[in-house]
From Swiss-Prot:
Enzyme Commission (EC) number: 3.1.1.96
Listed InterPro entries: Daa-tRNA_deacyls_DTD, DTD-like_sf
Molecular-function GO terms, alphabetical: D-tyrosyl-tRNA(Tyr) deacylase activity; Gly-tRNA(Ala) deacylase activity; Ser(Gly)-tRNA(Ala) hydrolase activity; tRNA binding
Catalysed reactions, semicolon-separated: glycyl-tRNA(Ala) + H2O = tRNA(Ala) + glycine + H(+); a D-aminoacyl-tRNA + H2O = a tRNA + a D-alpha-amino acid + H(+)
Entry's family note: Belongs to the DTD family.
Gene that encodes the chain: dtd
Native source species: Streptococcus uberis (strain ATCC BAA-854 / 0140J)
Record text about domains: A Gly-cisPro motif from one monomer fits into the active site of the other monomer to allow specific chiral rejection of L-amino acids.
Gene Ontology BP, a term: D-amino acid catabolic process
Keyword Cell cycle listed: no
UniProt signal peptide: none
Motif Gly-cisPro motif, important for rejection of L-amino acids: positions: 136-137
Organism lineage: Bacteria, Bacillati, Bacillota, Bacilli, Lactobacillales
The protein's role, per its UniProt record: An aminoacyl-tRNA editing enzyme that deacylates mischarged D-aminoacyl-tRNAs. Also deacylates mischarged glycyl-tRNA(Ala), protecting cells against glycine mischarging by AlaRS. Acts via tRNA-based rather than protein-based catalysis; rejects L-amino acids rather than detecting D-amino acids in the active site. By recycling D-aminoacyl-tRNA to D-amino acids and free tRNA molecules, this enzyme counteracts the toxicity associated with the formation of D-aminoacyl-tRNA entities in vivo and helps enforce protein L-homochirality.
Top EC category: hydrolase
Protein name: D-aminoacyl-tRNA deacylase
Length: 147
């Protein structure tokens, strides 16, 4: 499971010109699943994302978590995080989980996160337009296989 975590002051996702999810201060997550990912990866990622101290405190130090600031999450499925660019000029996506499996894990992931904080989301497999204002910028890549 690979996740690009971006600290944002606002973010939204639109499908066919209609905004289907929007947040203010919080995290934009681009989430991809590999064929060996499972519930253990989901649990690990949820724990890390909700407890990671990447928001500034009163002294401008990154000491606060998403939960501390009562922030929100915008979750976007992103199979392209598993792109293989070793050969040629066109990325291969054979290292990504099959859509049926990835869709199920994405649902589990979002459901688990929503128990901790407000969550908005894109639509799995849809062509989406994501807008964000990156705060910092702070962008972190989490790979659940690198623990």
């Amino acid at each position: 499971m690979k996740i690009v975590i971006q600290r944002v002051s606002e973010a939204s996702v639109a499908i066919e010109g209609e905004i289907v999810g929007a947040i203010q201060k919080g995290l934009l997550l681009l989430v991809g699943f590999g064929p060996e990912d499972g519930q253990e990866d989901v649990d690990y990622a949820v724990r890390k994302i909700t407890q990671m101290r990447i928001f500034s405190d009163a002294e401008d130090k990154m000491n606060l978590s998403l939960l501390d600031i009562k922030g929100s999450i915008l979750s976007i499925s992103q199979f392209t995080l598993f792109a293989n660019t070793k050969k040629g000029n066109r990325p291969a996506f054979t290292e990504a989980a099959k859509p049926e499996m990835a869709s199920q894990l994405y649902e589990q992931f979002n459901q688990a996160l929503s128990a901790f904080c407000p969550l908005e989301r894109g639509v799995f497999g849809a062509d989406m337009k994501v807008s964000l204002v990156n705060d910092g910028p702070v962008t972190i890549i989490l790979d659940t296989k690198n623990r």
